[in-house]
Amino acid sequence: VRRFFPRAITIAEESTAFPHVTTAQPGESLGFHFKWNLGWMHDVLQFFETPPAKRPASLDKLIHCRNYQFTEDFIQVFSHDEVVHEKKSLIMKMAGGETLDTKASDLRSLFVLLWGWPGKKTLFMGGEFGQIAEWAVNSSLQWELLESSIHQGLQQLVRDLNHIYITESTVHETDSLAEAFKFLDLDDDSGNLLAFLRRGNLPGEVKLFAFNFGASCQTKLFGVPEKGSWKVEINSSSTLYGGTLCEDQCATVVAGTDRPPYSIELDLPAFSAQILQYIR
């Protein structure tokens, strides 16, 4: 296929641990450009379907995804298969709370995790604005939901995540480099916090992704590798995305300590995610 159609992209939907689906070496690979990361999709959805009180015991599901992430060139995938046949829509899968507001907060965190995690992205139509009903082949999407600020906010978040993804190399150039991804402070006592760094190809190209998957606000000191400041690019709890934080709170510059090991302190609202850009 590559020889006769050099501009075509081939993607394998393969659910086992069969090796070398995308390996570039001739003769060692099936020759696909990408492979669906079904393991990641399964583990992540299972985590977000877990009630908040039980999430600390399940956080290892997200951490474990790192173990196989760089064995292939993956695409993180949320396809139509996950929103049909009584599996519920993405927003209705969220177990953060019973109200739509809380489910939307949980879904916003999921979106930041999807865009922040190494690998390409797919999101089936309707998920980007929080369609409530399952996908039905004979029905239109629930576009009327966009009259609500909750669904407008979800759509705006996806729009902003896409903008960061296509304009900032940190989150798309180093997908296959294990050394460009690093978890931070996995010894969190609460079991509800997760953070990781994404590095670009150039010195100083660093983003920090921080998550609070719990039902209460937390303040956390994260160790970081560089001295300097970090600007919050996205806070999923912003009113812009249907949350409750004012814009000033979402555009603060967080300073690091003056000596190594450097650290920054973040206030993390319940069911929230933040993206911070390192500033020299």
Question: PLM features: residue spans?
Answer:
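A generic helix-loop boundary/linker signal
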Residues: 104, 151, 220, 261-262
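Beta-rich accessory regions
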Residues: 148-153, 162, 166-172, 275-280
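Generic recognition of stable, solvent-exposed alpha-helical segments in well-folded globular domains
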Residues: 105-109, 149-157
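Active-site His/acidic residue clusters
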Residues: 135-145
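C-terminal accessory region downstream of the catalytic core in glycan-modifying enzymes
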Residues: 146, 153-154, 161-163, 222-255
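C-terminal beta-strand-rich structural cap/linker in extracellular carbohydrate-active enzymes
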Residues: 247-280
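Conserved alpha/beta catalytic core and glycan-binding cleft of carbohydrate-active enzymes
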Residues: 1-136, 166, 172, 176, ...
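A short acidic, glycine-rich active-site loop
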Residues: 97-101, 145-152
